[in-house]
Structures are given as C-alpha cells and as structure tokens.
From Swiss-Prot:
Residues 21-199 form the VWFA domain. The gene is yegL. InterPro entries: Tellurite-R_TerY (IPR011392), VWF_A (IPR002035), vWFA_dom_sf (IPR036465). Coiled coil: none annotated. It comes from Escherichia coli (strain K12). This is Uncharacterized protein YegL. It comes from the Bacteria. CDD domains: vWA_subfamily.
Amino acid sequence: MSEQITFATSDFASNPEPRCPCILLLDVSGSMNGRPINELNAGLVTFRDELLADPLALKRVELGIVTFGPVHVEQPFTSAANFFPPILFAQGDTPMGAAITKALDMVEERKREYRANGISYYRPWIFLITDGAPTDEWQAAANKVFRGEEDKRFAFFSIGVQGADMKTLAQISVRQPLPLQGLQFRELFSWLSSSLRSVSRSTPGTEVVLEAPKGWTSV
C-alpha cells in the first residue's frame, strides 16, 4: 500500500526554506460593517501585493487568517505565494477570547508540522485587529498569550480600530496595543509586510530591529 503524501509534506519537500508564520486575527463583527470592512479588505490586497514583490518572502512567509464574528478559519497556513486575500463581510458579535485560543492552537500545530519535517522557523507572529470589546470570556486566552510570550513561543501584537476597548487589549497583549489612525489599513499592512520581509531575511533565532510604526498609528 503506497504511503499518502500530504500537501504540507509535499510543500516542505519542494521548499525547505525556514518559515516565518503569521496569523491575522481579524474582527469582522457587525460594527465593522461599511467602510471599515472595505478598507480592511483593501489592506489585505496591499499586504499580498507587497509580499509578492519579495522573492525570498514568498518562500519563507506563511499566512493564516482567523476571523471572529463568529470564529472562523478563513485561511489555513499557506505560503505568501499561494495567499489570495479573502473578501471579508461584517457580521455577528466579538468572540475574541475563542478566536485568540484558536489562533494559538493553529500556531502550535504548525510548529509541530515544521519540526516533523525538519523545517526551521522564526518565532510566529499573531496580529490581532479589533474595533470593539470581547463578548466572550477572554481571561483564559490572555493568560495563554502571556505564558506564550514569556516562553518566546510567539509574538502577539494588537491593533485597536476606532471604538476598540484599549484597556482590555492592554490586559491581553504583553506589547502595548496600538491605535489605528482613522482607517489606515493599507498603511498598516504595508508596515506589516515590510516587517515580515525583514524577519524573513534574517537567521531564525536572531533578534530583528523592526521599522518603527509610522503613517498609521500614534505611539
């Protein structure tokens, strides 16, 4: 009986480059309806376009998307070369705690796949964008974020769109939550793609000095 080769295993065999995984954790609750969700969708297109311009990032950066309102894996981990931005629609409430837990589980599972296939990897990034407050229990998820950061299992970033509960975000993320200026999603994703490209050009395990956020937030 022939052994089946999964897509992931085949991908690792054809591309043994170290991986730089990033999960976008996106709030698509009802309050994002209208211009906010449209600008978010446009930002995702900018994100892909800028990654496409970097041949090394195409091989090394992997992207996943988890949306919440309700929690849904919009995009399992895939290479930047195979990333096609979904068109997101706003609906539902803001189950942020469950969404964070899902993203953390996806990151740990992907790291297991890397190790099983002999693929080195950079510390995963989890990038939360929200315009509201959690409508579910989030404290357990926050504890997991803090423990994971302490153990350097991932780097967790949080961005607050206008209306976001920044005080709660500060209790979830070790790093200071950053407010998005207006609806500057394209500028935000341009910075994110630049940061991931910088990381992907480094050696796994080394510290990378990131470009200071500008044009989309006030620090």
